Amino acid sequence: MAELAPDTVPLAGVVLAGGESRRMGRDKATLPLPGGTTTLVEHMVGILGQRCAPVFVMAAPGQPLPTLPVPVLRDELPGLGPLPATGRGLRAAAEAGVRLAFVCAVDMPYLTVELIEDLARRAVQTDAEVVLPWDGRNHYLAAVYRTDLADRVDTLVGAGERKMSALVDASDALRIVMADSRPLTNVNSAAGLHAPMQPGR
């Protein structure tokens, strides 16, 4: 199948910023990056904004965030994990007329546009409902989802499901083996955020 040129696949972006950040001990979204002028959520919006349009940020009710150049949606079911928030983000993307959305956690500062583009290209080539990276484990929150899965999410949540794995297991999913998993790194401490990582080769 012919390769699709970069940026030809319409793709929305959803940043899940409303997690409880128990291991961090503070809100990850507003954690300043080295240099202190940009927060983690601003950084993630900037990465996704290079490839995705529109971009949505899912936040908890009352969660303080810096002023962002994208819509902020408040989680209607806080405390239930990422599945309901993902569904809300997918629905917003679908209402914006976009068929695919890249969904990620807010704590992935080493995420690359190249990874996002690769997953989007695979989603179009295979027509899979979900395309997610795999490096020994599934990365549900760094994946491309069809936005029409929003209804399926609502059904799963209504049945008591809380895990992203429930959505992937109920969908036509394609797992992409990642030779370099550094872009998928989640930061769970301020020290981890400030620790430099070697660039990929």
Curated annotation (Swiss-Prot):
Its EC number is 2.7.7.77. The N-terminal domain determines nucleotide recognition and specific binding, while the C-terminal domain determines the specific binding to the target protein. It is an enzyme of class 2 (transferase). Transfers a GMP moiety from GTP to Mo-molybdopterin (Mo-MPT) cofactor (Moco or molybdenum cofactor) to form Mo-molybdopterin guanine dinucleotide (Mo-MGD) cofactor. This is Probable molybdenum cofactor guanylyltransferase. InterPro entries: MobA-like_NTP_Trfase, Molybde_CF_guanTrfase, Nucleotide-diphossugar_trans. Gene3D superfamilies: Spore Coat Polysaccharide Biosynthesis Protein SpsA, Chain A. It is found in: Cytoplasm. It catalyses: Mo-molybdopterin + GTP + H(+) = Mo-molybdopterin guanine dinucleotide + diphosphate. Transmembrane segments: none annotated. It comes from Mycobacterium tuberculosis (strain ATCC 25618 / H37Rv). One of its GO terms (biological process) is Mo-molybdopterin cofactor biosynthetic process. One of its GO terms (cellular component) is plasma membrane. Keywords: Cytoplasm, GTP-binding, Magnesium, Metal-binding, Molybdenum cofactor biosynthesis, Nucleotide-binding, Transferase.
